[in-house]
């Protein structure tokens, strides 16, 4: 899960991901876990 240390572009990217693909994206971002 992404934390508060994420760059602004990531935060903005997550804010527009409000569909069924969000879980899939979270899994893809799992390796970048802070």
Curated annotation (Swiss-Prot):
It comes from Capra hircus (Goat). The modification Phenylalanine amide is found at residue 34. GO terms for cellular component: extracellular space. Gastrin stimulates the stomach mucosa to produce and secrete hydrochloric acid and the pancreas to secrete its digestive enzymes. It also stimulates smooth muscle contraction and increases blood circulation and water secretion in the stomach and intestine. This is Gastrin. GO terms for molecular function: hormone activity. The keyword Transmembrane helix does not apply. Belongs to the gastrin/cholecystokinin family. It comes from the Eukaryota.
